[in-house]
Swiss-Prot record:
Residues 52-184 form the RUN domain. It comes from Bos taurus. Residues 1-293 are annotated as: Interaction with RAP2A. Residues 262-317 form a coiled coil. The modification Phosphoserine is found at residues 227, 411, 414. This is RUN domain-containing protein 3A. Residues 211-234, 367-399 are annotated as: Disordered. PANTHER family: RUN DOMAIN-CONTAINING 3 PROTEIN RUNDC3, RUN DOMAIN-CONTAINING PROTEIN 3A. The modification Phosphothreonine is found at residue 210. CDD domains: RUN_RUNDC3A.
Length: 441
C-alpha cells in the first residue's frame, strides 16, 4: 500500500514537473514569436516616419519587451530597490554599466522617475532613441554571473532565445523613435498587457467571400432563381482582382524591404564587430611577439651568465694544476732574481773591504736565511718535477698549502729596501770610496 502510494506520488511529481517545464517553454516561444511579429510591424509601418508614445504598435512592442525582460525574474527583495520591488531595471543597471557612454546614470538621476518599473520603461525608450537596444542586451547577456543572479533557469535571458532576441532588435536601428519621458506612462504603477489580437487575425483567402458577402449572397439566393451554384465563390470583376493582386504584392514588397534593411543593419554590425576583433587580434599578436623577443633576450643573457659562471668554476676546480704551477714558477723566478745583489755584496765587496763590521744594533738575519731557504726549495721543486707529474702531492688539493705559502711570503720584508737597510743599521764601511750600493738612500 505504501509502495503504491509512493509510486503514485512520484508519478504525479514527474507529471507536474513536465507540465511546468512545458508551460515555461510555451511562454518563451509565445513571447519570442510575438516579439518577432511586433518588430516586423514596426519596420513595415514606420521606416519613413518617427514613432512616439501615441503609436499603438510601439506601446504593444514595449509591453512585449518588458514581459521578456521580466520573464522568470527572481522574486521581490525589499532591500534592493527603493519601491520594495526588484524589476528588470536592477539587472540592466548592473549588467549594462560596462557599455561605453551608457544612459544608466542619466536615468538614475531623473527626478520624476522613482520606481524601478518606471526606470525600466524609461530605459527602453532611451535605448530605442539611441538605437542601441541590441548592444545593451548583448552586453548584459555577456555578464553571465549577473544574469544567473537575477533570472531563474527557464528564463528567456538564460536560454538561446536571448540570442534570437538580440538579432531581432538590430533592425530597430532603422527606425527613428521620439519620446517624452515626462508622462503618466512612466509612473510604474500600472502593469502592461500584451495585445495579441493584431497578430491573431485570420487572413482570409481572396477565393472566398467575407461574412457579410456570404449573408448577402445567401439572402439573394433565396429570392432569385439565377443565383450561382457555388455561393462561396467571389463575384469580383477583373479590376477588383488586379487591385487585390497589386495590394498583395505591395505588402510583400514592404515586408521584403523591411527585411532587407534589417539584414543590412545586421551585416554592418557584424562588420564592425569583425573589425574590432581583428584590431584586438593584431594587438595581442604584437604583445605576443614582444614577449617572445623579451624572452629570447633574457635567455641569451642567462646563457652568458651561465657560461661565465662555468668558466669561474673551471678555474677553481683542482683537477687542472697548470695555471697554479705556472704561477709558482713565476714566483720562484722573482724570488731568485732578487738575491744576486746580496751575493755580490757578500763576495766581492766583502773581500775588498775586510774592515766591514756589524754594529751592536744589527738586525737578526733569520728572515734572510728563511728567504734564502725558500728560494732554494722552490728551485729544487721546480727542477725536480717532471712535466707529467702534478704539482704537489697526488690526490691532494695544493690550494691550502699555497695559501699558507702566500701568508709567509707576505710577512717577509722586501729586498727593495735592502740598500736603506744596509745603510741605516746593518753594514758600515770605513773605506773612503763610496759604493753606489752602500750609499744612503
Amino acid at each position: 500500500m505504501e509502495a503504491s502510494f509512493v509510486q503514485t506520488t512520484m508519478a504525479l511529481g514527474l507529471s507536474s514537473k513536465k507540465a511546468s517545464s512545458r508551460n515555461v517553454a510555451v511562454e518563451r516561444r509565445n513571447l519570442i514569436t510575438v516579439c518577432r511579429f511586433s518588430v516586423k510591424t514596426l519596420l513595415e509601418k514606420y521606416t519613413t516616419e518617427p514613432i512616439d508614445d501615441s503609436s499603438e504598435e510601439f506601446v504593444n512592442f514595449a509591453a512585449i519587451l518588458e514581459q521578456i525582460l521580466s520573464h522568470r525574474f527572481k522574486g521581490p527583495v525589499s532591500w534592493f530597490s527603493s519601491d520594495g520591488q526588484r524589476g528588470f531595471w536592477d539587472y540592466i543597471r548592473l549588467a549594462c554599466s560596462k557599455v561605453p557612454n551608457n544612459c544608466v546614470s542619466s536615468i538614475e538621476n531623473m527626478e520624476n522617475i522613482s520606481t524601478a518599473r518606471a526606470k525600466g520603461r524609461a530605459w527602453i525608450r532611451v535605448a530605442l532613441m539611441e538605437k542601441r537596444m541590441s548592444e545593451y542586451i548583448t552586453t548584459a547577456l555577456r555578464d553571465t554571473r549577473t544574469t544567473r543572479r537575477f533570472y531563474d533557469s527557464g528564463a528567456i535571458m538564460m536560454r538561446e532565445e536571448a540570442t534570437v532576441l538580440t538579432g531581432m532588435l538590430i533592425g530597430l536601428s532603422a527606425i527613428d523613435f521620439s519620446f517624452c519621458l515626462k508622462g503618466e506612462v512612466l509612473d510604474g504603477k500600472t502593469p502592461v498587457v500584451i495585445d495579441y489580437t493584431p497578430y491573431l487575425k485570420f487572413t482570409q483567402s481572396y477565393d472566398y467571400l467575407t461574412d457579410e458577402e456570404e449573408r448577402h449572397s445567401a439572402e439573394s439566393s433565396t429570392s432569385e432563381d439565377n443565383s450561382p451554384e457555388h455561393p462561396y465563390l467571389p463575384l469580383v470583376t477583373d479590376e477588383d482582382s488586379w487591385y487585390s493582386k497589386w495590394h498583395k504584392m505591395e505588402q510583400k514588397f514592404r515586408i521584403v524591404y523591411a527585411q532587407k534593411g534589417y539584414l543590412e543593419e545586421l551585416v554592418r554590425l557584424r562588420e564592425s564587430q569583425l573589425k574590432d576583433l581583428e584590431a584586438e587580434n593584431r594587438r595581442l599578436q604584437l604583445q605576443l611577439e614582444e614577449a617572445a623577443a623579451q624572452n629570447q633576450r633574457e635567455k641569451r643573457e642567462l646563457e652568458g651568465v651561465i657560461l661565465e659562471l662555468q668558466e669561474q668554476l673551471t678555474g677553481l676546480i683542482p683537477g687542472d694544476h697548470a695555471p697554479l704551477a705556472q704561477g709558482s714558477k713565476d714566483l720562484t723566478t722573482r724570488l731568485v732574481n732578487q738575491w744576486p745583489s746580496l751575493g755580490t755584496l757578500s763576495g766581492a765587496e766583502g773581500a775588498n773591504n775586510p774592515k766591514l763590521y756589524r754594529r751592536h744594533s744589527f738586525m737578526s738575519t733569520e728572515p734572510l736565511s728563511a728567504e734564502a731557504s725558500l728560494s732554494s726549495d722552490s728551485q729544487r721543486l721546480g727542477e725536480g718535477k717532471r712535466d707529467e707529474e702534478p704539482w704537489g702531492p697526488i690526490g691532494k688539493d695544493p690550494t691550502p698549502s699555497m695559501l699558507g705559502l702566500c701568508g709567509s711570503l707576505a710577512s717577509i720584508p722586501s729586498c727593495k729596501s735592502l740598500a736603506s737597510f744596509k745603510s741605516n743599521e746593518c753594514l758600515v764601511s770605513d773605506s773612503p770610496e763610496g759604493s753606489p750600493a752602500l750609499s744612503p738612500s
